[in-house]
């Protein structure tokens, strides 16, 4: 897959190390690393992360070996940036959605995730037909959620899985204090509703 731009929605403990590593990792065919843009919604509690990243600083607290240097080097090289504007997703080849999902009682709480996907879907509607960007949900989802919730949500915006977008799920497990190590070295489970999607997710 010829990936030139990746958008990472949510610079938390999953999204930030993924964005940093992707921005310095050459493709398997030897082509340069993709340009990576981190998308963080403007909010009183998290909006500051955009300025921090654009200044070359990781917004993740605590000691995370290697992360600060990777972020600083990638920003200095012009391969990593951050924005509040979800429309940065509109020309991305791959969109990684790394928004935390919690529980409300025994049921999963998808409010923040769906809010993020609303912005992603609005942005992707601007793309030319047939470009089929890959949208990978890195959040933890209950079984069948891609089929019963995510795909119908995108369809409401006229984005049909397999035709207009390729929807995939690849939940990430991380460990504070070892974020870079876990993201770089852990095996990944990849899934999608369309038969092509797992192959594309694995290659992204």
Where are these regions (language model features)?
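N-terminal Rossmann-like NAD(P)+-binding domain of SDR-like oxidoreductases, especially those catalyzing
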Residues: 6-8, 15-17, 21-22, 42, ...
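Short acidic low-complexity segments
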Residues: 76-91
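N-terminal glycine-rich dinucleotide-binding loop that anchors FAD/FMN and/or NAD(P) in oxidoreductases
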Residues: 52-80
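NAD(P)+-binding Rossmann beta1-loop-alpha1 motif at the extreme N-terminus of oxidoreductases
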Residues: 1-59
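Rossmann-like NAD(P)(H) cofactor-binding subdomain of soluble oxidoreductases
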Residues: 103-174
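Glycine-rich, N-terminal phosphate-binding loop of Rossmann-like dinucleotide-binding domains
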Residues: 97-99, 139, 193
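Internal alpha-helical scaffold of NAD(P)-dependent oxidoreductase catalytic cores
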Residues: 152-169, 174, 179-204
């Amino acid at each position: 897959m010829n990936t030139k731009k990746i958008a990472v929605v949510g610079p938390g403990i999953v999204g930030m190390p993924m964005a940093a590593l992707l921005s310095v990792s050459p493709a398997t065919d030897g082509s340069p690393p993709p340009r990576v843009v981190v998308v963080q919604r403007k909010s009183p509690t998290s909006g500051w992360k955009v300025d921090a990243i654009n200044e070359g600083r990781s917004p993740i607290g605590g000691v995370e070996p290697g992360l600060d240097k990777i972020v600083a080097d990638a920003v200095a090289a012009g391969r990593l940036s951050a924005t509040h504007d979800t429309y940065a997703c509109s020309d991305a080849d791959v969109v990684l959605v790394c928004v935390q999902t919690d529980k409300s009682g025994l049921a999963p709480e998808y409010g923040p995730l769906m809010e993020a996907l609303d912005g992603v879907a609005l942005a992707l509607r601007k793309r030319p037909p047939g470009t089929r960007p890959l949208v990978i949900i890195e959040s933890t989802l209950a079984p069948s959620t891609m089929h019963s919730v995510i795909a119908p949500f995108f369809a409401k915006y006229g984005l049909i899985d397999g035709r207009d977008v390729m929807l995939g799920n690849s939940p990430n497990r991380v460990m504070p204090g070892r974020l870079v190590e876990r993201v770089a070295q852990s095996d990944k489970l990849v899934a999608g509703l369309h038969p092509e999607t797992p192959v594309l997710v694995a290659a992204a």
